[in-house]
Amino acid sequence: MRGEFYQQLTNDLETARAEGLFKEERIITSAQQADITVADGSHVINFCANNYLGLANHPDLIAAAKAGMDSHGFGMASVRFICGTQDSHKELEQKLAAFLGMEDAILYSSCFDANGGLFETLLGAEDAIISDALNHASIIDGVRLCKAKRYRYANNDMQELEARLKEAREAGAHHVLIATDGVFSMDGVIANLKGVCNLADKYDALVMVDDSHAVGFVGENGRGSHEYCDVMGRVDIITGTLGKALGGASGGYTAARKEVVEWLRQRSRPYLFSNSLAPAIVAASIKVLEMVEAGSELRDRLWANARQFREQMSAAGFTLAGADHAIIPVMLGDAVVAQKFARELQKEGIYVTGFFYPVVPKGQARIRTQMSAAHTPEQITRAVEAFTRIGKQLGVIA
């Protein structure tokens, strides 16, 4: 039986390769930035990182991280409730809460952990969760761990969300929570949070938003999709990451009212049984929030880059998904074409990744480009020119 198990895995891997669905990990030998070095020593322009504000290799963050290690050490060798809470952890939690307009915040090792430890902790069998169909895998997995009755609604479809809310209430649900991404990361679409909050008010439901692809750069002050949609103060729970716009390292958080956060500290298993966030990351994250609040220069540069890329790619004839976001998916349809396109682009010095099933539905393969404040206008033009040449070679555009 053991031999059969390993043979099955071997067969599945071979099938994935044959169908063009096998994901290869490419090696980077430099720091994460707009211009990176790959394993063969060549330099390429990176258009597939979550490095929205270009801070992943910023000297001020590196200095803050080093200072954090000098003052608070390398690691805590403990979970938070035993001997793993430093003053800097509390400072970061307070700053995150204030920045997001929430009462309190709690740190996790990742946003995956924040979502994984949220629903089961707060809701029981008599409750209901209504989740957007395109929510991140961490929300999906977190919901699966919860005993609450589960409902799903079509992406951003307020009519279907209302139908599910009616179902939950008619079934006698005690507490009802609507869970949605703030930005749907495969499409670059911002959630209709105003519609969600209006329905939540109508049906007395809670609202939870995973804002990993928004906090730091979406909204007038970069506070996230709830600021962009003008619903600050109407979202009950916000989860997010420190691993994208806010420095790009690792770490996650949940922000909510104090009683929610305090209960998570008592019962959320990923929080209780994971080591504390490293002092270097905590110190750098505090610095990031200071930089984001200091001005809009990085956000302005990011949005200018996103506009330039979208306009030039549309003019070249490409089909693009999303709108009003730094995620700009180039739709290709076929998984094999997406992978070949990405390989050819790397030969041209443009570093991207093809996304295909099971990450996206079959027939909706794409190259998800992501703009950064670190990109220059010249780098964006160079990328569009490379896309255009290869797109014509592969018959994607005329």
What are these language model-derived features?
Residues 51, 151, 155-209:
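Active-site phosphate-binding strand-loop segment of PLP-dependent enzymes
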Residues 79-85, 93-117:
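Short loop-beta-helix segment that forms the pyridoxal 5′-phosphate
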Residues 9-74, 205:
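N-terminal "arm"/small-domain region of PLP-dependent enzymes with the aminotransferase-like
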Residues 203-206, 213, 218-324, 337:
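Active-site C-terminal subdomain of aminotransferase-like
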Residues 125, 145-147, 203, 234:
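Short, structured coil segments at secondary-structure junctions
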Residues 300-309, 314-349, 359, 363-364, ...:
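Conserved PLP-binding catalytic core of the aspartate aminotransferase-like
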Residues 59, 63-67, 71, 98, ...:
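PLP-dependent enzyme catalytic core of the Aspartate aminotransferase-like
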Residues 118-137:
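Conserved PLP-anchoring active-site segment centered on the Schiff-base-forming lysine
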